[in-house]
């Protein structure tokens, strides 16, 4: 506000038309005729010019000297009084001339009054222009209101954008839900596949059960056939022995027949061997079927494990769904709360805007200083009225003291000389002042540039403003003291006060107008120099004119007497006007008191605003920190979401891998089904073949059963090892899955905690927003007050226009009134400047709105600016020192400057507060945007939750379906339990294997290394499957051949029996002759019971011992047979005792060898079991061992089948040799 008054006071002298008057009076100096009383005119004009020159000085000093003051008017009146006295003393000399001169002076005064009227008209035009400016300012205010409406519309647009962003977030949530649905569907599909696999396995188990039953029946039939075959073979062996005895007798006669028979026997042996190999092939097929059964049981167990894992996954999915539901409900509630808080924050922001507008209006209350200035003008007018009263008294005294004019003239001459000296001094002072002013202007330009920078940076110096407020309070106290001093010093320092006011106003004006003012000041200084030269010339002319006036004073006295009457009439009018002005002065004083009270209230409000601004700053800093923290949290949540997505991708990949594994298992199952179908076809064929072999398979049932048991134990061990490997792998996979799930749970818990923290922070932010809303309401109230102040300013302007009209009426008195009118014009210019400043303020408000965006960047530069401010303060201190040197004439006026500066600082503080309020509004707008974003996120979360609910409902339905399937599976499992009861021995072995599994858990690392070996085993399995298929084909071909050979052998045996019977009949006739041979036959019968007993023992022996005995004694049998043949052929002449001893030793050797083989076989069984436990860790080589064992078993079976035939053949040879002997 002070700056407005400064510019107004400084710009008033430009409109003043006073300087041209002295130039008009120059030609009057040359005229000295009687028609044109030049001396009187020159004296009058010189007297008139003297105050004008004084007025021109202030113009040159540029607001340092104001318009002529009342003391100059007094001086003019004194000169008039002296003229009256001289005229009274010289009444006889020239009263007529004086009357003419006074008339001419009156004419000139009238001309000056007309000029003043013209100036008044110009001032009125200026007032009209100022009114136009006010209208423009009002239009700009309207534009500002329109801008506010535009801002509101833009805020609505931002709301719509926020809604669009929310919709985009909702779409993203939809996408996520779709992805979750796909995952759930994939899991369900996997469950369905598992269930289908279980069903297929159960069906296969039923089929396998049926096949086992069929194979068991076939085995029984085959064993019965084998027993029948063994019986037939024994009968045939007995017959062969009889025949061999008979053939030995008839050997000499029928040597060729014996050779044929031996060849036939060999053929029989070969046929029997082929039959035994066929039986072994069938046994191998049965063992293969048992292996397939075991594999399928293992697959069933694996499927059970998978079911359990699926159950775990389902339970975990249900838990996750429940947790997601809870989180969704919480997020919905939070979204509702955030919506309410956002609406409240918007309302609060609108309130803050209204409060800022009120603050702007309150800032305009600073215009109250205009009232004080008007009152100061009224006081000056009152003083001038007092001076007029004194002049009237002096006129009365002049009538009484006409006799004393001569003395006064002499005193006037002395005064003139003193005034000349004073004028010379004043000229010197003016020169020094001009030089100082130039220096000050140069300094002030620098200060002005620095002040502009300071003004731009005042918003950055918020901390320094607090210290300035304290200084302002001190300055206000000093201003009050200075006002008290002013009242005492104004009477004494009226003349000096005008000059000092003009200087200070010029200084203030220079601070605002910078370089332009320098040029104006230089031009004015040039004008002042010319005016000083003119005044010097006029002074010399005035001396001559005074001498001439002394001659014409007598003439002027008469004219003055006539003019006194008119002057008295004018004085009466002036008195009336003075009374009116006194009444107005009283009213102005009352208004001053009101303004002071209003000013105090404004200072208190400013303090409150400062506190509010500080609180708003702290709140804004907190909001910024909270926003930064929220941004960091959003980044962390985004990173966690990315990690979760990566984990999901990895889990999906693993699921794909598991699906591939399942597909491979399905392929294997299809292969197994194909194999089973082929086995069924083979079974059909075997049934046909078994019907033919039932007679031969009875004797070998026990051996086959034990062999199958051994093979089953080996295969079970291998299967158990495989199951253990599969279980361990699945356990590892499940453990990894569980760890991932645990990690996800921890991450979800951390995210939930972060959401709770965000909620707490949002609550804090809402509280801060409520506090800001209260401060905004206060600002709105202050803006209302500012509007009232604006209205009061408008009323003051109207009053000022009324005062100007009154001043125009007073201007008729003389140049004094003209000077007063110039002051009024300066006030009008101040009003114009105020209007211009209002426009500038509006522009600045717009600029401040733009600067708000740059405030954050400029806060970092505050420290540098503080140093610059200190430099500026140093420069200001230097400038203040210079100003104090110039203003030593009156310190009280400096106090007024400080008051004006206080007002300026207050205005600047208000601006800074407005800027802070705008910042807070921007921050609130940012907070609104963040809240809008959060609302969008919450909406998306709500949509996702709804989708999740739908998915959860569908998942619950599917879970119910799965439960039903589980029940069906449980029923099937109950059915399978019946199957598992038959495998109690396997369960016992599984218990032992489980114990070993606990030990093998420590060897998990070794299993990882053996993964490659498992792959090789898979390759071997494939090759083994191919071999099995080839062997099955070979077996079918061999079975066909063997059956044909067996049938052919049976026919041959029957033919031989017939031929043998015939020969027996022929030989029976020869028995009577061979009595000695009969006795030997009895001895042979004695040995035969021994052999029979040994045979019975052999039958009583276990089939496993017989197998071992045949395996170990093959060589001994061949050796004994060879010896028997040698005995039969080469040693016919030995004694009976030697033959019997040899046979006895051979039988002992056979028995001992059989016992040794039994012992060795038992030891081999123990060793095989130990090796089975030791080789349990080497599951990768199980298939190769199985193949080796199968080869060994096949060889053993072949040897076993050969051994009894060889023994029987040896016995026959013995009998033949004995019979021959």
Swiss-Prot record:
Residues 1073-1083, 1106-1116, 1129-1160 have a biased composition (Basic and acidic residues). One of its GO terms (biological process) is reciprocal meiotic recombination. Residues 1-68, 1073-1221 are annotated as: Disordered. It comes from the Eukaryota. One of its GO terms (cellular component) is chloroplast. Residues 32-58, 1084-1097, 1175-1187 have a biased composition (Polar residues). Keywords: Chloroplast, Coiled coil, Plastid, Transit peptide. Residues 95-149, 202-543, 587-1084 form a coiled coil. It is found in: Plastid, Chloroplast. Residues 1-82 form a transit peptide. PANTHER family: SYNAPTONEMAL COMPLEX PROTEIN-RELATED, WEB FAMILY PROTEIN. Belongs to the WEB family. This is WEB family protein At4g27595, chloroplastic.
């Amino acid at each position: 506000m002070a700056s407005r008054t400064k510019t107004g006071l400084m710009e008033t002298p430009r409109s003043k038309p006073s300087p041209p008057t002295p130039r008009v009076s120059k030609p009057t100096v040359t005229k000295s005729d009687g028609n044109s009383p030049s001396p009187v005119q020159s004296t009058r004009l010189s007297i008139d010019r003297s105050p004008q020159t004084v007025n021109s000085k202030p113009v040159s000093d540029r607001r340092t000297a104001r318009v002529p003051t009342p003391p100059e008017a007094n001086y003019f009146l004194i000169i008039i009084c002296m003229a009256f006295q001289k005229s009274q003393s010289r009444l006889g000399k020239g009263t007529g001339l004086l009357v003419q001169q006074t008339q001419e002076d009156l004419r000139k005064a009238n001309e000056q009054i007309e000029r003043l009227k013209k100036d008044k008209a110009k001032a009125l035009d200026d007032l009209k222009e100022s009114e136009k400016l006010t209208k423009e300012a009002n239009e700009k205010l309207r534009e500002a209101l329109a801008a506010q409406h535009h801002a509101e519309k833009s805020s609505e647009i931002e709301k719509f954008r926020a809604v669009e962003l929310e919709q985009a977030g909702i779409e993203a949530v939809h996408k996520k839900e779709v992805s979750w649905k796909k995952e759930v569907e994939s899991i369900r599909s996997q469950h369905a596949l598992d269930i289908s696999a279980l069903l297929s396995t159960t069906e296969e188990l039923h089929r396998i059960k049926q096949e086992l039953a069929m194979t068991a029946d076939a085995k029984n039939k085959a064993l019965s056939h084998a027993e029948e075959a063994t019986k037939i073979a024994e009968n045939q062996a007995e017959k062969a022995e009889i025949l061999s005895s008979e053939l030995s007798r008839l050997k000499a006669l029928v040597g060729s027949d014996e050779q044929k028979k031996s060849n036939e026997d060999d053929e029989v042996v070969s046929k029997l061997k082929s039959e035994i190999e066929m039986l072994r092939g069938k046994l191998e097929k049965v063992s293969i079927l048992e292996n397939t059964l075991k594999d399928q049981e293992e697959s069933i167990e694996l499927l059970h494990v998978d079911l359990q894992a699926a159950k775990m996954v389902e339970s975990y999915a249900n838990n996750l769904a429940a947790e997601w539901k809870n989180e969704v409900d919480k997020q919905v509630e939070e979204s509702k709360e955030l919506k309410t808080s956002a609406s409240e924050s918007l309302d609060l922001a609108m309130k803050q805007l209204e409060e800022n507008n009120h603050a702007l209006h309150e800032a305009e209350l600073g215009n109250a200083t205009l009232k004080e200035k008007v009152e100061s003008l009224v006081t000056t007018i009152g003083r001038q009225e007092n001076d007029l009263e004194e002049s009237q008294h002096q006129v009365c005294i002049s009538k009484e003291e006409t006799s004393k004019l001569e003395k006064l003239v002499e005193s006037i001459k002395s005064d003139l000389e003193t005034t000349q000296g004073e004028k010379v001094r004043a000229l010197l002072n003016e020169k020094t002042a001009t030089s100082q002013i130039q220096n000050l202007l140069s300094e002030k330009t620098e200060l002005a540039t620095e002040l502009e920078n300071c003004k731009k940076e005042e918003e950055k110096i918020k901390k320094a403003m607090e210290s300035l407020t304290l200084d302002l309070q001190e300055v206000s106290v000093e201003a009050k003291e200075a006002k008290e001093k002013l009242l005492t010093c104004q009477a004494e320092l009226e003349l000096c006060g005008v000059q000092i006011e003009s200087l200070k106003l010029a200084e203030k004006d220079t601070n605002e107008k910078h370089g332009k003012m320098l040029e104006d000041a230089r031009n004015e200084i040039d004008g002042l120099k010319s005016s000083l030269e003119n005044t010097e010339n006029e002074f010399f002319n005035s001396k001559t004119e005074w001498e001439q006036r002394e001659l014409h004073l007598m003439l002027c006295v008469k004219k003055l007497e006539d003019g006194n009457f008119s002057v008295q009439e004018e004085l009466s009018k002036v008195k009336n006007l003075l009374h009116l002005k006194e009444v107005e002065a009283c009213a102005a004083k009352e208004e001053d008191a009101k303004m002071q009270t209003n000013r105090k209230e404004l200072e208190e409000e400013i303090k409150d605003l400062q506190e509010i601004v500080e609180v708003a700053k702290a709140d804004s800093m907190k909001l910024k920190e909270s926003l930064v923290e929220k941004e960091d949290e959003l980044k962390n949540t985004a990173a966690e979401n990315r990690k979760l997505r990566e984990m999901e991708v990895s889990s999906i990949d693993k699921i794909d891998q598991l699906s591939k594994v399942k597909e491979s298992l399905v392929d294997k199952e299809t292969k197994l089904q194909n194999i089973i179908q082929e086995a069924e076809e083979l079974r059909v064929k075997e049934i046909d073949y078994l019907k033919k072999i039932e007679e031969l398979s009875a004797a070998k049932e026990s051996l086959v059963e034990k062999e199958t048991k051994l093979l089953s134990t080996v295969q079970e061990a291998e299967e158990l090892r495989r199951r253990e490997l599969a279980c361990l792998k699945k356990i590892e996979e499940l453990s990894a899955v569980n760890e991932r799930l645990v990690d996800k749970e921890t991450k979800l818990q951390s995210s939930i905690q972060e959401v709770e923290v965000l909620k707490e922070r949002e609550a804090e932010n809402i509280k801060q927003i409520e506090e800001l809303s209260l401060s905004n309401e206060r600002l709105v109230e202050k803006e209302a007050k500012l509007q009232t102040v604006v209205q009061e300013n408008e009323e003051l302007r109207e009053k000022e226009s009324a005062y100007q009209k009154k001043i125009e009426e007073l201007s008729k008195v003389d140049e004094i009134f003209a000077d007063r009118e110039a002051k009024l014009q300066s006030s009008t210019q101040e009003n114009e400047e105020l209007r211009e400043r209002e426009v500038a303020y509006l522009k600045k408000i717009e600029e401040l709105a733009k600067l708000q965006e740059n405030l954050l960047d400029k806060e970092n530069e505050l420290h540098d600016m503080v140093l610059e401010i200190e430099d500026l303060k140093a420069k200001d201190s230097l400038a203040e020192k210079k100003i104090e040197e110039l203003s030593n004439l009156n310190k009280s006026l400096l106090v007024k400057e400080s008051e004006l500066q206080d007002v300026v600082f207050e205005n600047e503080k208000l601006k800074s507060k407005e800027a802070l309020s705008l910042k807070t509004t921007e921050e609130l707008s940012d907070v609104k945007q963040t809240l809008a974003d959060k609302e969008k996120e919450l909406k998306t979360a709500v949509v996702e939750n709804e989708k999740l609910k739908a998915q959860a409902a569908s998942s619950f339905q599917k879970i119910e379906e799965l439960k039903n399937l589980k029940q069906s599976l449980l029923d099937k499992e109950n059915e399978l339990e019946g199957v598992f009861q038959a495998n109690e021995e396997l369960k016992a072995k599984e218990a032992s294997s489980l114990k070993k599994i606990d030990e093998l858990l420590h060897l998990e690392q070794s299993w990882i290394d053996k993964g490659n070996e498992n792959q090789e085993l898979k390759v071997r399995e494939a090759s083994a499957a191919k071999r099995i298929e080839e062997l099955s084909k070979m077996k079918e071909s061999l079975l066909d051949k063997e059956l044909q050979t067996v049938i052919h052998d049976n026919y041959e045996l029957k033919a031989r029996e017939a031929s043998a019977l015939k020969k027996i009949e022929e030989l029976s006739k020869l028995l009577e002759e061979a009595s000695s041979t009969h006795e030997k036959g009895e001895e042979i019968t004695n040995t035969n019971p021994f052999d029979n007993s040994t045979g019975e023992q052999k039958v009583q022996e276990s089939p496993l011992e017989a197998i071992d005995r045949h395996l170990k004694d093959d060589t001994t049998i061949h050796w004994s047979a060879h010896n028997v043949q040698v005995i039969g052929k080469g040693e016919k002449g030995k004694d009976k005792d030697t033959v019997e001893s040899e046979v006895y030793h051979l039988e002992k050797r056979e028995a001992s060898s059989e016992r040794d083989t039994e012992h060795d076989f038992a030891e081999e069984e123990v060793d095989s079991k130990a090796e089975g436990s030791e080789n349990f860790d080497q599951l990768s080589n199980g298939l190769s061992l199985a193949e080796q064992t199968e080869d060994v078993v096949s060889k053993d079976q072949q040897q076993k089948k050969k051994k009894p035939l060889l023994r029987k053949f040896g016995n026959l040879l013995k009998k033949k040799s004995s019979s021959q002997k």
